[in-house]
Regions:
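N-terminal Rossmann-like dinucleotide-binding module
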Residues: 1-20
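Acidic-histidine catalytic/liganding microenvironments
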Residues: 33-34, 85, 99, 197, ...
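Short catalytic-loop micro-motif centered on adjacent basic/acidic residues
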Residues: 41, 62-65, 90-93, 200-202
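Short, Asp-centered acidic motifs that coordinate Mg2+ and/or phosphate
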Residues: 3, 38, 118
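Rossmann-like dinucleotide-binding domain that binds NAD(P)(H)
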Residues: 141-220
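A contiguous active-site-proximal alpha/beta segment in oxidoreductase catalytic domains
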Residues: 69-148
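A structural signal for well-ordered alpha-helical segments within the folded catalytic domains
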Residues: 49, 53, 76, 99-103, ...
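Beta-loop-alpha module in the N-terminal Rossmann-like domain of NAD(P)-dependent dehydrogenases
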Residues: 14, 19-81
Length: 220
């Protein structure tokens, strides 16, 4: 780790000292640093597009957390930038697509001649001991200004509005956040296995305000 950047001064200082890395209050200065080869973007979703675009334009390889952007407009800009720099590796953090279990599943599906009639995916969220034991204790900070928080919330709301339209409801926003925050992992996995869906057949509510979607895929 060569350099780090964070919106919290105390968090930035702590991480820089822990990993003996340079500290940048301005992330755009970090991506321009000559000793930085690749950039990991782990910021809130609403900053992914700007940081990734800046990194690509600075000639850096990019790993950006999911969702890569919150609206199509920003995604198209990133795709154009990535295509203009074929020498760079740019990827989104869909780690499930690289797990041994998933790769084995993909191999088995490809080698089986039987037609797939139905696929069902579940997301299990558990910050259990297996994961927590591999991480350091949380380092909490309380020095992020109200102005920065307000700007972040405003930016996020604006990008979701651009994606859904001005007349979108709070319920639609919540559903969209669930899709981009968690559901995108499942969608990325099933797309890797069977390709792009051709239509959304139905959407209906279940318990605890959750939503279930039926997608139709062109499975042979």
């Amino acid at each position: 780790i060569t350099a780090v950047s964070d919106v919290s001064p105390t968090q930035l200082k702590h991480i820089a000292e822990t990993y003996r890395a340079k500290a940048y209050a301005d992330p755009y200065m970090l991506v321009k640093a000559p000793d930085v080869d690749a950039v990991f973007i782990c910021s809130p979703d609403q900053y992914h597009a700007d940081y990734a675009l800046a990194a690509i334009e600075a000639g850096k390889h990019v790993f950006v957390e999911k969702p890569v952007t919150l609206c199509i407009e920003d995604l198209e800009k990133l795709i154009a930038a990535e295509k203009a720099h074929p020498e760079l590796v740019c990827m989104v953090g869909y780690m499930r697509r690289y797990s041994q279990g998933f790769l084995k599943c993909k191999e088995l599906l490809a080698s089986d001649d039987r037609k797939i009639e139905y696929m069902r995916f579940r997301d299990i969220i558990l910050e259990g001991d297996f994961f927590m034991d591999q991480t350091r204790p949380p380092y909490l900070c309380s020095d992020i200004s109200d102005e920065v928080k307000a700007e972040s919330s405003s930016r996020r709301r604006d990008q979701i509005t651009r994606a859904l339209g001005n007349d979108c409801t709070d319920q639609q926003r919540t559903t969209y956040v669930m899709l981009t925050g968690l559901g995108c992992h499942t969608l990325a996995a099933v797309r890797e296995l069977v390709g792009l869906p051709v239509e959304v057949e139905s959407v209906f509510p279940q318990v605890m305000q959750s939503r279930t979607c039926h997608y139709c895929f062109p499975i042979q």
